[in-house]
């Protein structure tokens, strides 16, 4: 692998530290939670020159105290001043490392698939600079700082504070939202999920391995010496909560999150290679209901796209995926423009990693899920030296999948009969209204016998003679819908008695037959798996008495046959409609653009991206029961009753800190669950937290609740003047007008991820 010199002595300059300080100052509300500039303004220009020279010589002294944000709230001590200096140095190091690894990892040493999939983990800076600062000379390895042209123009930065704020907010606040956004476009036929949490036990072995990662790309060992000092002082650590945004660690440690992603990057490469070699998207085979036109497409596919002539069953080895990857792409394009239904075998894996949390979506059998689980967990233990816990496998139809504190559910698209079942109650109500109007009309008529004859005549001949009349068409539709629901079995026996077209009846029969074949296929796989397992167990007993080489070879052949039996790993998909083919084709292109250009304000989108956004197969919901338990553990709600109480943990702090802590928590909740469908129901929990804040203030001052209302008003306003109003808690008007996805991040507060991830 090609190595280059990172050359810390040339990169760390006073201009770089000045830019790091200026960027933190513009984005200080995201990281520090203070409302004064006393610490930022106390840093002089000479400090940048002195610090850069000390870092180059290796004499810079790092603070020995962990970063605590609550110390910042109380006073501006010398200890906090040293911690701020460390944040400036840490941010400067991150600027160098991030852009260096963009070029070295994702351009020279990676294939195209890995580059596309992982480029969003590190490439945040370049697109924002290119958009906001088009005249700025920028390099992938490291953008140069020009003393006279850019850095000393303080007015330029002051006029572009929004750019710096957008840069920090998009990079560090929307990674979880991007993970949920990616899950929305997974395949709708996913049947099983697997969640996993990696235990971050950082020791000497991991530190040496991280050092070896640096040595692969650079021979500048002096750079890692400075990083090793940070690890020894616990200022940077990938095994602690420093990787999360929280209220206890000064926002977060940016280097800790970066090093964790860099360390687990090899695991992402392993997953990409495994998916590329083992999994396939679709394989065709001929079905029972094959018409002449369908058989033509089938024969055309066998001749042009698939190298093997397939009859009833076929096997696909992993190496065929590499040889015929282009043909699989062409077959998707071919069937895109032909509205034909065909049947497929499918086997694919979808996954998303957020720091040390992973979720997998499987389009395969359960045998393949356990096979993949053993492979990946073996890789984590033996290659990355990481352990794991909380490995759970969920069925998408029965179980509630929870990832990052959010429920994942299907965005179901109902067919004709499912709509009738869902709306059965509505149909019955309409039917009762029609009967009521019918009875009222009967009473109004004088000649009941004459009316009954007319009504029976209309009822028998409403279709097709009087179909255009609104009342009779509604009556006919709802009565027939109700009959279909009640006599579903008779619907398939006496099809000529119903008004539905023949094509719909034929397609319905086809769907039910394919559902039955799917069930029989799964049953066949299970019986075959049990049979092979029994054979292996019997051969184990036989080998205990005989150790002939032929027996060993036969045993190995049976074991390999069971291991490489593709039918046991595939998922049988009987219905692969034109809608799903076309949208999957578009979503494949959309996923490419998402991984390449996410967080870049929608730049460089292809033709398919804008159309694919409306086809989302998964929804997210707030788990209110889990969230209620979290509120009780944090002390906002009574442990046994459903009512707010005063938080005992905050009684010793000042009122300003209490108000800010409650507001910080509420904004974190609104940020995290802004993507959920039931986001509007969070208003009730926000009001509970508001009442808990009032009760906490009353308990601290030993006053009545009316006293807190009179002092801080109902919106918890800390101070109010003619020109400025300081309020850390969202107002009631803001909460009432808040809608889903309309709230992203408030400029005054950071995001506390430890509430949802622990």
Swiss-Prot record:
It is found in: Plastid, Chloroplast. Keywords: Chloroplast, Plastid. GO terms for biological process: homing of group II introns; mitochondrial mRNA processing. The keyword Cytoplasm does not apply. GO terms for molecular function: RNA-directed DNA polymerase activity. The keyword Plastid applies. GO terms for cellular component: chloroplast; mitochondrion. This is Maturase-like protein 2.
């Amino acid at each position: 692998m090609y190595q280059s010199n990172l050359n810390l002595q040339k990169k760390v300059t006073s201009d770089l530290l000045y830019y790091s300080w200026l960027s933190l100052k513009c984005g200080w509300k995201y990281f520090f939670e203070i409302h004064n500039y006393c610490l930022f303004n106390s840093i002089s220009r000479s400090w940048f020159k002195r610090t850069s020279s000390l870092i180059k010589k290796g004499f810079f002294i790092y603070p020995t105290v962990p970063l605590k944000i609550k110390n910042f709230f109380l006073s501006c001590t010398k200890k906090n001043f040293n911690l701020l200096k460390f944040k400036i140095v840490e941010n400067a190091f991150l600027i160098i490392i991030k852009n260096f690894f963009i070029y070295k990892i994702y351009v020279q040493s990676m294939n195209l698939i890995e580059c596309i999939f992982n480029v969003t983990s590190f490439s945040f800076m370049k697109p924002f600079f290119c958009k906001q600062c088009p005249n700025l000379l920028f390099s992938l390895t490291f953008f140069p700082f020009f003393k006279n042209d850019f850095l000393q123009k303080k007015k330029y930065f002051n006029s572009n504070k929004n750019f710096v704020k957008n840069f920090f907010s998009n990079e560090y606040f929307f990674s979880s939202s991007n993970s949920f956004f990616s899950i929305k476009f997974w395949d709708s036929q996913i049947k099983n999920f697997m969640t996993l949490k990696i235990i971050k036990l950082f020791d000497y072995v991991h530190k040496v391995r991280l050092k070896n990662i640096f040595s692969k790309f650079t021979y500048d060992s002096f750079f890692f010496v400075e990083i090793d000092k940070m690890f020894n002082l616990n200022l940077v650590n990938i095994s602690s909560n420093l990787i999360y945004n929280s209220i206890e660690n000064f926002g977060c440690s940016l280097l800790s999150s970066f090093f964790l992603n860099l360390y687990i990057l090899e695991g992402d490469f392993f997953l990409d290679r495994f998916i590329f070699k083992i999994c396939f998207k679709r394989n065709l085979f001929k079905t029972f209901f094959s018409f002449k036109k369908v058989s033509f497409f089938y024969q055309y596919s066998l001749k042009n796209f698939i190298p093997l002539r397939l009859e009833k069953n076929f096997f696909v080895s992993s190496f065929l995926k590499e040889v015929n990857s282009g043909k699989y792409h062409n077959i998707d394009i071919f069937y895109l423009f032909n509205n034909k239904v065909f049947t497929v075998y499918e086997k694919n894996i979808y996954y998303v990693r957020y720091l040390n949390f992973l979720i997998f979506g499987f389009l395969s059998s359960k045998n393949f899920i356990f096979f993949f689980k053993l492979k990946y967990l073996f890789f984590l233990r033996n290659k990355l030296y990481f352990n794991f816990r909380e490995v759970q496998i969920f069925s998408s139809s029965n179980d509630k999948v929870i990832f990052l504190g959010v429920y994942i559910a299907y965005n179901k698209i109902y067919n004709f009969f499912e709509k009738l079942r869902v709306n059965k109650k509505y149909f019955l109500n309409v039917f009762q209204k029609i009967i009521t109007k019918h009875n009222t009309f009967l009473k109004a008529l004088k000649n009941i016998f004459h009316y009954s004859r007319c009504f029976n005549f209309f009822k028998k001949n409403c279709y097709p003679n009087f179909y255009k009349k609104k009342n009779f068409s509604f009556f006919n539709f709802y009565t027939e819908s109700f009959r279909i629901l009640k006599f579903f079995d008779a619907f398939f026996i006496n099809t000529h008695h119903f008004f539905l077209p023949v094509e719909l009846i034929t397609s319905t029969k086809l769907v039910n037959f394919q559902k039955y074949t799917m069930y029989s296929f799964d049953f066949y796989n299970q019986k075959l798996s049990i049979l092979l397992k029994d054979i292996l167990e019997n051969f184990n007993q036989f080998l205990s008495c005989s150790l002939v080489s032929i027996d060993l070879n036969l045993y190995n052949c049976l074991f390999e046959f069971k291991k490489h039996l593709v039918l046991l790993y595939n998922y049988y998909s009987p219905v692969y409609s034109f809608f799903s083919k076309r949208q999957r084709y578009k979503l494949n292109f959309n996923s490419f653009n998402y991984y390449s250009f996410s967080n870049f304000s929608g730049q460089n989108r292809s033709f398919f991206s804008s159309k694919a956004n409306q086809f989302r197969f998964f929804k997210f919901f707030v788990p209110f029961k889990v969230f209620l338990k979290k509120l009780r553990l944090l002390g906002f709600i009574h442990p046994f009753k459903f009512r707010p109480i005063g938080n005992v943990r905050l009684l010793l702090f000042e009122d300003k800190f209490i108000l800010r802590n409650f507001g910080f928590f509420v904004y974190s909740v609104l940020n995290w669950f802004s993507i959920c469908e039931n986001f509007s129901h969070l208003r009730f929990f926000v009001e509970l937290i508001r009442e808990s804040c009032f009760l906490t203030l009353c308990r601290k001052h030993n006053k009545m609740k009316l006293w807190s209302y009179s002092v801080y008003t109902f919106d918890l306003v800390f101070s109010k003047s003619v020109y400025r109003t300081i309020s850390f808690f969202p107002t009631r008007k803001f909460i009432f007008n808040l809608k889903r996805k309309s709230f992203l991040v408030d400029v005054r507060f950071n995001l506390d991820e430890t509430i949802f991830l622990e």
